[in-house]
Amino acid sequence: MNWNNHNIPIDPESASLIEQLAVDYINHSEHCMVVDGYAGWDKNYRVKVRTFCTRTYHALFMRNMLIRPTEKELEEDFSKGVDIQIFNAGEMNISKNIPGVTANMVTALNLSQRRMTILGTQFAGEMKKSVFKILQYYYPRKNILTLHSSATLNENGTTTLMCGLSATGKTALGLRSDKRKIIGDDETCWTNDGIFNIEGGCYAKIIDLDRTIEPEIFNSIRYGSIVENASFHPDSRSINFNDVSITPNSRTSFPLNFLKNVNLPAVGPHPKNIIFLTCDTKGVLPPVAKLNHDQAYYQFLSGYTAKIGGTDLSASTPSSTFSSCFGEIFLPLHPTVYANMLIEKIKKHNVNVWLVNTG
């Protein structure tokens, strides 16, 4: 485990107490919802996830973001147990008197038992990133590389990965072309057989959303989708996409099948191109550059970009930052573990690597 400002150790007694507080809160709430779903579209590597929560919108969020099992799979597969459990008691504040707790909210991860507990925050993105972090710990042991990236498939059957922090363009660029099908917009795995999307849905930023520029996202905001951290125009009751009074990190969650140009099941062959999306607001990097293996290794490890409001980093104004692997906050292992795997796969499959500056 790579301990740092994002991965903070806590003693087993405190972790057990935090989990018990969440379980007790859920058990004594008026409503308790349980959502079962798969993470990972490749059936050889998918895992079963079970979420316990008290808010309907959290349940719908996980129903959107996980891969929905069939009735037969629910009966025959999930009845045998699950691989990951999430206890979301986000409405309950946590006491700083518990040893190891440093804030009034906590996301506590028990890797040995694959359980995540959430207290003190109702941000739905915590659940999907909990699954991502657990898989980023276990998948590399199976030689599966986890990437904070979107993935697309073109008409010729070749795939492209776009790695980047939140708000650098992974979702927007992945959905922009009618000639490319979206495989996933945020969490991609690269195996010995090809690539697959971890998620069953999209979690897209909607700040300043324009129907003419991003029609796919706009048209996916309908019955069954979720809009989070947004306000409404008082007269028309339509969404005010330009309001940042709550946070710039306003988002929508919807299942992949809401998109007309999606590749389902969300799997594909080994990528032909990998694009590092860098929102360089200082003008240091060129608009486009092709990288050799050493440059790709350095750029992936340094993760130079700008802080933009998102699930991993939030800021009211852009500022330069470095985030290893374009998602350091999600990495349980040392960044070189993922960087070494990436370069090995790039060399093995003769992949082109590009840097694109979206700043």
Q: What does each model-identified segment do?
A:
Residues 79-141:
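Charged, amphipathic alpha-helical linker segments immediately N-terminal to NTP-binding catalytic cores
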Residues 140, 148-150, 154-165, 175-179, ...:
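Glycine-rich, often acidic-flanked micro-motifs
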Residues 170:
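Conserved lysine of the Walker
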